[in-house]
Amino acid sequence: MNQATQIIPFTTSGSLVDYVDRKVIVVLRDGKKLIGILRSFDQFANLMLQYTIERIYVDDMYGDIDRGVYIVRGENVVLLGELDLDKEYDAVKQLRRMPAEELYPLAKLHEEEKKKNIREKGKYLHSVGFSVDGGHDDLY
């Protein structure tokens, strides 16, 4: 096969067509995890999900918040993938389901601890000569 006829994988938003009407998980830039049925998308990878839930994980617990129809701006999508329903069930049954109202404060606390650890690690790395992303001396 010569270079002119070589098959190139389709990596634009058009590659989402295989996921339409399937259950997907979408991870957003802010860390939210959305699970729903992908109903539509456009050339900017803006997504429309139906029967959407936001799933919160904390340690060995999880909680779901019903979000219904959810529109996601494409630039906020970090990851999108089809869910294997059997594997999802097997994975979730190893966790304890909790009311999302109880998990939300715990998730916020975990997130703050994570940010604090990242800041401390950044300070240490800066003290030994490394540049920290987003720091005042980061010129990129």
From Swiss-Prot:
Alphabetical keyword list: Cytoplasm, mRNA processing, mRNA splicing, Nucleus, Ribonucleoprotein, RNA-binding
Stretch list, region Confers RNA-binding specificity: 129-140
UniProt superkingdom: Eukaryota
Annotated compartments: Nucleus; Cytoplasm; Cytoplasm, P-body
SUPFAM superfamilies reported for this sequence: Sm-like ribonucleoproteins
Domain Sm, residue spans: 11-86
InterPro entries in the cross-refs: Lsm1, LSM_dom_sf, PTHR15588, Sm, Sm_dom_euk/arc
PROSITE patterns with a match to the protein in the record: SM
Major localization class: nucleus
GO BP annotations listed: deadenylation-dependent decapping of nuclear-transcribed mRNA; mRNA processing; RNA splicing
MF (Gene Ontology): mRNA 3'-UTR AU-rich region binding; mRNA binding; poly(U) RNA binding; RNA stem-loop binding
Gene Ontology CC entries for this record: cytoplasm; cytosol; Lsm1-7-Pat1 complex; nucleus; P-body; ribonucleoprotein complex
Protein role: Component of the cytoplasmic LSM1-LSM7 complex which is involved in mRNA degradation by activating the decapping step. The LSM1-LSM7 complex loads onto the 3'-end of single stranded RNA.
The protein's assembly and partners: Component of the heptameric LSM1-LSM7 complex that forms a seven-membered ring structure with a donut shape. The LSm subunits are arranged in the order lsm1, lsm2, lsm3, lsm6, lsm5, lsm7 and lsm4.
Family membership noted in the UniProt record: Belongs to the snRNP Sm proteins family.
Full protein name: LSM1-LSM7 complex subunit lsm1
